[in-house]
Regions:
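Extended, well-folded catalytic/binding cores that form a central cleft or groove in large enzyme
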Residues: 1-592
Length: 592
């Protein structure tokens, strides 16, 4: 699938927005959008379209905007409407010669409630245009698309706000408009089913989406995050996953301590924060090779590259022909870039190693791996008790409690009450609000009869007794001994009659297991099995895997690992509402 098409469509939309007004203009962004939209349009592109200033949208108005045209680009959020109103009122109060013009674009869709709010605030009439910036998916890499809806899971489970399901459905319609109709759709979980039902309803209203002939995508698997909560809480042990958990990767960029790098390394260095910024994506050859490896395999790759560069440097140049010398000189910038890349990733690997070789990290990892193996899940865990006694960061304690709860299909009521008492005593009464959120989200609960995780661990081989990290034969390598259930579902589906067999195995998990076939208007699709179809062609099948509620880099690495196995003959396009890790996922539930 050519992800470039998606980027080009978003750029066309953006050009229309920027050309809505003549001359110099300022953009005031919803802060959550600046980074993702930067993946679609670089700064030079904005300059070409006469954008002279960019500001984040904040409660206190900007005072120094000296251009005539002000464009607001925002998510449909009522609080942000108050910020827009404050900015417009502040501008209108100034004594100036020329009036300013205001334009508002909602990403991805307008909202009736937001427009109403602007009327109440008395600024609706001041806006020359209220439009839409239709960009549902942001392209993070050539196989990875994210909607960047950071609170989707929380909105669904805590706030009962299902607007992200409608947005997901719109994104899937947009995908089919670009790449053609997806003939086969499979899914697991209530919200996965809801997203698909809304998508079908929208397709019926929109003939352009429905009449498409089958495109380049063969099928789609929609996975509701609530089906597999263990994988989102587990520590990722891949190179990219660890960088994300320790330093945070946002819109493919990571900020690292500047003093560890040469001044020439990285995109930029911020003197105030003393951070150097790096872009991490598959355009950099070495990172593409490292990103999906277990961290214990990273050293081997780095040392191989170092030897290769050294041997190139030691080649004798005296007996080369002029033609060979010319070739050598032309290749010098490429060699220099390789050396730079090797130096950067060797330093990043050292930074990561310092963290993961600490006792704190290893002790916590040991505790979570015991839970993955279902050992001692029915009684208070002594490591968790020690963490509480030491007043360790609340998030670390809650994560392990939630993992114990998932492994035991709930905590025994006595154990749950005991943990609650201990937490309140040490961290204060407000932790009860957080615990309430975790209970609503399905992360913490009292035990019921059925041991779901325990059974699935056996039937789907979710854990390995001995880790295979350097030359893995199974997806367990991404967490050392644990295979993400979400990806195991995809892997099982690739087998003959895989979905039928899965339907039975997954019956104990919440929500329906469904399959659907979209025939084109002119031709009904044969319900043939996926595998019989695959054998007729050597072209890899393209499968979209869509996570409703977020997915981790470890899950992405596991899917890439599956696509590299020759027997599977598939290519995955991974779509998600948000890229998450154990920290960012839990933070949405913690009440400060």
């Amino acid at each position: 699938v050519n992800v470039q098409l998606l980027q080009e469509a978003a750029v066309r939309e953006f050009v229309d927005i920027l050309d809505c007004c003549e001359g110099a203009k300022a953009i005031i962004w919803d802060e959550s959008l600046g980074g993702p939209v930067g993946l679609v349009a670089r700064y030079t592109f904005l300059k070409e379209h006469h954008v002279t200033k960019m500001y984040p949208l904040r409660p206190e108005p900007w005072t120094e905007i000296d251009v005539k045209n002000i464009i607001f680009i925002t998510r449909p959020n009522q609080l942000l409407m108050d910020y827009i109103a404050a900015n417009i009122h502040a501008e209108e109060k100034k004594k100036k010669v020329s009036r300013k013009e205001y334009f508002l674009y909602f990403l991805p869709k307008k909202s009736f409630l937001c427009e109403k709010r602007l009327q109440v605030k008395g600024v609706h009439g001041s806006l020359s245009v209220i439009g839409e910036f239709r960009c549902d998916f942001f392209p993070f890499d050539n196989d990875l698309l994210s909607m960047e809806l950071k609170d989707a899971y929380k909105e669904l489970y805590i706030e009962g706000d299902t607007s992200c399901l409608h947005q997901s459905a719109c994104a899937l319609i947009g995908l089919q408009k670009l790449y053609g109709r997806i003939p086969k759709v499979y899914g697991k979980g209530s919200y996965a089913q809801r997203v698909w039902d809304i998508t079908k309803a929208l397709a019926e209203e929109d003939s352009e989406a429905l009449n498409n002939d089958k495109g380049v995508i063969d099928q789609m698997i929609i996975i509701d995050r609530s089906v597999d909560l263990m994988s989102v809480l587990a520590t990722q042990l891949t190179y990219e996953g660890l960088i994300d958990e320790i330093y945070g990767i946002n819109n493919t960029t990571v900020n690292l301590p500047a003093e560890k790098f040469n001044t020439s390394e990285g995109l930029s260095t911020d003197r105030n924060t003393e951070k150097s910024q790096f872009i991490l994506n598959s355009k950099e050859q070495l990172f593409a090779e490292l990103r999906d490896k277990n961290f214990n395999a990273v050293g081997v790759v780095l040392s191989r590259h170092a030897k290769s560069i050294k041997s190139r440097a030691n080649e004798k140049h005296s007996d080369m022909s002029i033609q060979e010398l010319k070739k050598l000189v032309e290749g010098l910038p490429h060699i220099k870039a390789k050396e730079q890349s090797l130096s950067t990733h060797t330093t990043i690997a050292e930074l990561v190693k310092n963290v993961i070789s600490s006792d704190d990290f290893l002790d916590e990892l040991g505790c979570e791996q015991e839970f993955m193996m279902c050992s001692d899940v029915d009684k208070p865990n002594s490591f968790i008790e020690d963490l509480i006694a030491k007043e360790a960061p609340l998030r670390s304690v809650l994560r392990l409690m939630c993992m114990q709860s998932i492994a035991g299909s709930g905590l025994k009521p006595k154990v749950l009450d005991y943990y609650k008492r201990e937490l309140v005593q040490v961290y204060g009464l407000q932790t009860l609000l957080t615990i309430g959120n975790l209970e609503k989200a399905g992360l913490l609960r009292a035990q019921t009869g059925q041991r779901t995780y325990h059974v699935l661990r056996k039937t789907l081989n979710l854990t390995a007794e001995t880790p295979e990290e350097v030359s893995p034969k199974d997806i367990t390598y991404v967490h050392s001994i644990y295979a993400p259930l979400s990806v195991r579902i995809v892997e099982q589906h690739l087998k003959p009659n895989g979905w039928q067999m899965l339907t039975e195995k997954l019956s104990s998990l919440p929500g329906p297991t469904f399959e659907d076939f979209q025939s084109s208007a002119s031709l009904s699709t044969r319900r043939g099995s996926f595998t019989s179809e695959i054998s007729q062609s050597d072209i890899p099948r393209v499968i979209v895997v869509f996570f409703v509620g977020g997915c981790t880099f470890a899950e992405i690495s596991a899917l890439r690992f599956l696509s590299q196995q020759e027997d599977n003959n598939v290519e995955f396009v991974i779509c998600t509402t948000k890229l998450v890790n154990k920290n960012t996922f839990l933070d949405t539930f913690i009440e400060n």
